[in-house]
């Protein structure tokens, strides 16, 4: 089991690296999910995620779905899931090997710290995005 500190990591790069590793059979635990960064224009990112969240079932709008997460750990898990062949048994088994936490609740010792160099001031953390989506964490 590898414990990764995700503070300062870019969302897509972190998710792709974790997806590759869990497909190889490694168990991954990610801590500090709220400090993961999405680069780009803050307003555009918030608008995109809110549109995704507000999608309705066209056939019957009273039904619930599709479900989209609000909390930072769930957003990170969903991003990793999108990078796995989730509808196949191999992808489902790999996804079960991923654990994501806000903060470090179990005081796990960090094996790796993944952080990417930010060359821009245009970014938003998952904590800020979650607040805009209405999360209470």
Curated annotation (Swiss-Prot):
State the PROSITE patterns in the record: RIBOSOMAL_L13 (PS00783)
What keywords are assigned to this protein? Ribonucleoprotein, Ribosomal protein
The record's annotation in InterPro entries points to: Ribosomal_uL13, Ribosomal_uL13_bac-type, Ribosomal_uL13_CS, Ribosomal_uL13_euk/arc, Ribosomal_uL13_sf
Please provide the Gene Ontology terms (biological process) for this protein.
negative regulation of translation; translation
> One GO term of the cellular component aspect?
ribosome
Ranges in a coiled coil: none
Record keyword Acyltransferase present: no
Q: Which domain of life is it from?
A: Archaea
Task: Tell me the GO molecular function terms.
Answer: mRNA binding; structural constituent of ribosome
Free-text function comment from the UniProt entry? This protein is one of the early assembly proteins of the 50S ribosomal subunit, although it is not seen to bind rRNA by itself. It is important during the early stages of 50S assembly.
| PANTHER family hit by this protein | LARGE RIBOSOMAL SUBUNIT PROTEIN UL13, RIBOSOMAL PROTEIN L13
Instruction: Describe the family membership recorded for this protein in Swiss-Prot or TrEMBL.
Output: Belongs to the universal ribosomal protein uL13 family.
How is the subunit organization of this protein annotated in UniProt?
Answer: Part of the 50S ribosomal subunit.
NCBIfam families recorded? L13_A_E (TIGR01077), PRK06394.1 (NF005004)
Question: Which protein is depicted?
Answer: Large ribosomal subunit protein uL13
* Source organism of this protein record: Methanocaldococcus jannaschii (strain ATCC 43067 / DSM 2661 / JAL-1 / JCM 10045 / NBRC 100440)
């Amino acid at each position: 089991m590898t414990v990764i500190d995700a503070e300062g990591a870019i969302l897509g790069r972190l998710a792709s690296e974790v997806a590759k590793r869990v497909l190889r059979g490694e168990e991954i635990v990610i801590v500090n999910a709220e400090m993961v960064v999405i680069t780009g224009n803050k307003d555009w990112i918030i608008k995109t995620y809110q549109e995704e969240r507000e999608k309705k079932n066209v056939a019957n709008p009273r039904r619930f779905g599709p479900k989209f997460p609000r909390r930072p750990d769930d957003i990170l898990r969903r991003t990793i899931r999108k990078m796995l062949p989730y509808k196949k048994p191999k992808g489902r088994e790999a996804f079960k090997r991923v654990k994501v936490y806000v903060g470090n609740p179990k005081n796990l010792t960090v094996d790796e710290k993944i952080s990417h160099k930010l060359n821009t001031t245009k970014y938003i953390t998952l904590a800020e995005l979650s607040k805009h989506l209405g999360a209470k964490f």
